[in-house]
């Protein structure tokens, strides 16, 4: 059974593929099968992924307000996907903020460049503070 961390890795893969494939969802089952995401974890993955897509404009507008020199669209695909996942979980789920931040940092360490964990932590931390 996949862990929640592996589920979040899969969501990042789905968001990345979504952008590269001109927003065509034919890749969803292929990615989930490849990563062995099944049953409850598949439902959790799809809920996160679809929730992000359903709220994408709101998420991006919110993130843009915390990006000093950039717009969300100017960031790399991986960093953008991690920020969107983190923002979605902070804004639309009951996942504790400490877990969201920790997962986002770990994903950035694994998947993005060396400066990304600190950057992602700063943006999501600012979002948490503004939400209070």
Swiss-Prot record:
One term under GO cellular component: cytosol
Tree of life domain: Bacteria
GO BP field: DNA-templated transcription termination; transcription antitermination
UniProt keyword terms in alphabetical order: RNA-binding, Transcription, Transcription antitermination, Transcription regulation
GO molecular function: RNA binding
Alphabetical list of InterPro entries matching this protein: NusB-like_sf, NusB_fam, NusB_RsmB_TIM44
Pfam families: NusB
Role according to the record: Involved in transcription antitermination. Required for transcription of ribosomal RNA (rRNA) genes. Binds specifically to the boxA antiterminator sequence of the ribosomal RNA (rrn) operons.
Family: Belongs to the NusB family.
Record-given protein name: Transcription antitermination protein NusB
Gene name of this polypeptide: nusB
């Amino acid at each position: 059974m996949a862990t929640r961390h592996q589920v979040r890795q899969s969501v990042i893969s789905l968001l990345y593929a979504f952008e590269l494939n001109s927003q065509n969802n034919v890749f969803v089952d292929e990615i989930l099968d490849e990563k062995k995401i099944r049953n409850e974890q598949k439902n959790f993955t799809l809920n996160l992924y679809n929730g992000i897509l359903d709220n994408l404009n709101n998420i991006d507008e919110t993130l843009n307000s915390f990006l000093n020199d950039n717009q969300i669209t100017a960031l790399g695909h991986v960093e953008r996907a991690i920020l969107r996942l983190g923002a979605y979980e902070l804004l639309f789920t009951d996942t504790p903020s400490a877990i969201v931040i920790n997962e986002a940092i770990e994903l950035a360490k694994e998947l993005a460049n060396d400066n990304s964990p600190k950057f992602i932590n700063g943006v999501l931390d600012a979002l948490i503070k503004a939400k209070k």
